[in-house]
Amino acid sequence: MEKKHYGAIDGLRMIAAFGIVMMHMRANNNYEISGFVYNNVIPSFTNFVFLFMTVSAFGMCCGYYQKVLNNQISWSDFYGKRFKKILPFFCLLVLLDVAMSHSLGSIYEGFADLTLVFGFLPADTISVIGVGWFLGLIFVFYLIFPFFCVLIENKRRAWMAFGVSLIYNFICTSYFDVGRTNILYSACFFLAGGLIYLYREQIAHFNQWIVLGITCISIILYYVIGGYSVMCLLVSSVLLIYAILKAGGVLQNSCLLYTSPSPRDAHES
């Protein structure tokens, strides 16, 4: 089958990355600018991490879903590739942080960071490269990806798993007191990406203007209702669906494509 690349997803991912950088810059600067955009919109960019979860699951499915189900993948190569891609630069950041902290606790945490499996630790355990929690969560997703593919092997099972993940998201907040750093809390976003992958052929026939309208409405509702999980899930899903439909335009301009991360996993094999 000819490989298909969803180029607009690269642009969407890069816009989300810029948004998260803006959020961190606002949180750490020493000056104040009044206005709705500065006080409400930019802080909400922290929830772009949920879009990354949905896009990551979709991209992984494009690259590996069929290979996993057909037993056509070398897991040594799969995980080795991810260690080689993530660890060198992250290791440098961790070592610099440990050197600046120079405490026994930072050494323990640095060790956990360098294994890349610190996503299994309880929330708020790691302060060395504390913002790297998302990397830990994504690596947990990589580790359970074979099971993830089994969960979405067919649409019926995928919908059942998605329903269970929504319940988990609710009870994680209301009872277990864990948040987005936990894989069970965030599972619904990854499964949403998997479901969108399963329906990608049907989605290709959607009217992009109608989807754009739904996307705009969902973003407005997000700011009216609030950044609850269900709204983050809705916005992330419709943005991904629109990116699948959209070719060219602002999501696929040369500047964004040049600065976007490697799109290799977003090729459908």
Give the location of each predicted region.
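Membrane-cytosol interface segments of multi-pass membrane proteins
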Residues: M1-F170, Y258-P261
